[in-house]
Amino acid sequence: MGQLGALLHLVDPTLPIGGFNHSNGLETFVQQGKVNSRASLEEYVQTQLMQNWIYNDGAYLSLAFDAMANHDLDRLLQLDQELAASKIARESREGSYKLGVRLLKIFIRYENHPLLSEFQQAISEKRCQGYFPIVFAMVAQAMNLDKAETLYAFYYNAAVGVVTNGVKLVPLSQMDGQDILFALRTPLAQAVENSLNPDLDWLGAATLASDIRSMQHEQLYTRLYMS
């Protein structure tokens, strides 16, 4: 039961890291009329899951989890730098490492793991940024969480964020949002299966439409979100 509690704490939406402030380009899609219904929001989140997250944040989380298990700080720093290069839009890039730094600040107070301290020192020395998926993986492994369950929780947390933001932005009913989440159960499990041993040739696969909307977000006339 202790591991379940730790995992629930790690994905708790009330963690004071600011995740609710970011739409990662969804706000642009809505303002341009590309996402305007329950069906289009469901298509959007499933596309993000199966064509973006499993090759980017999820894949790097998986690799960082393994590097943490192997006590390989150099590999963690390398993965953090590679993930930085894959995040084209400034707002999304900055948002991710700000979330990561805040997450590390919370959990390092309770998890006495030397690599967490060394990674935090590397951030302060500008040797890495501390991107959210990397830190998430490190904290999860430090708490001896199961890798597959960690990936599922990460993807589910990301999906909930998209659906919550979409319900607010379109707008849609709360029940529409719940229906979308119910429909994600099988895709989430498939995403986890695909991410347990990522294909290195697909790391950082581009999602041009999302990257463009994330960059356009900076120029929107009105904005509810920081990205």
Swiss-Prot record:
Main subcellular location of this protein, as a coarse class: cytoplasm
Places the protein is found: Cytoplasm
InterPro entries: UreF, UreF_sf
Any GO CC annotation of this UniProt entry: cytoplasm
GO molecular function: nickel cation binding
Pfam families in alphabetical order: UreF (PF01730)
Keywords from the named record: Chaperone, Cytoplasm, Nickel insertion
Assembly notes: UreD, UreF and UreG form a complex that acts as a GTP-hydrolysis-dependent molecular chaperone, activating the urease apoprotein by helping to assemble the nickel containing metallocenter of UreC. The UreE protein probably delivers the nickel.
Family: Belongs to the UreF family.
Function: Required for maturation of urease via the functional incorporation of the urease nickel metallocenter.
Stated name of the protein: Urease accessory protein UreF
